[in-house]
Amino acid sequence: MKTIDPRHYDVIVAPVVTEKATIASEHNKVVFKVASKATKPQIKEAVEKLFDVKVKSVNTLVRKGKTKVFRGQFGSQSDVKRAIVTLEEGHRIDVTTGL
């Protein structure tokens, strides 16, 4: 049985299921919300170990938080870091199923 480092679960926070992410999945790409301090090598290692796939490349982006007004009260959204993971040919991840 393979052993998974518990820190990998801290790197990958959640899959992103949006229209744009669904279109990217047709091109062998998967989008994850990741920890803000996570680096590309950490993300690559976590995805390879957790999902048992080979990663070709990792691209990251940070969506800056915004100030919003809700019922007259000001609030702020946090920054969100996303990783677009490109998988090798023949590898797939189904994000609708759990780990």
UniProtKB/Swiss-Prot annotation:
This is Large ribosomal subunit protein uL23. InterPro entries: Nucleotide-bd_a/b_plait_sf, Ribosomal_uL23-like, Ribosomal_uL23/eL15/eS24_sf, Ribosomal_uL23_CS. The gene is rplW. One of its GO terms (molecular function) is structural constituent of ribosome. It comes from the Bacteria. It holds the Pfam family Ribosomal_L23. It comes from Rhodopseudomonas palustris (strain BisB18). SUPFAM superfamilies: Ribosomal proteins S24e, L23 and L15e. The keyword Iron does not apply. One of its GO terms (cellular component) is ribonucleoprotein complex. One of the early assembly proteins it binds 23S rRNA. One of the proteins that surrounds the polypeptide exit tunnel on the outside of the ribosome. Forms the main docking site for trigger factor binding to the ribosome. Part of the 50S ribosomal subunit. Contacts protein L29, and trigger factor when it is bound to the ribosome. NCBIfam families: PRK05738.1-3, PRK05738.1-5, PRK05738.2-4. GO terms for biological process: translation. Keywords: Ribonucleoprotein, Ribosomal protein, RNA-binding, rRNA-binding. Belongs to the universal ribosomal protein uL23 family.
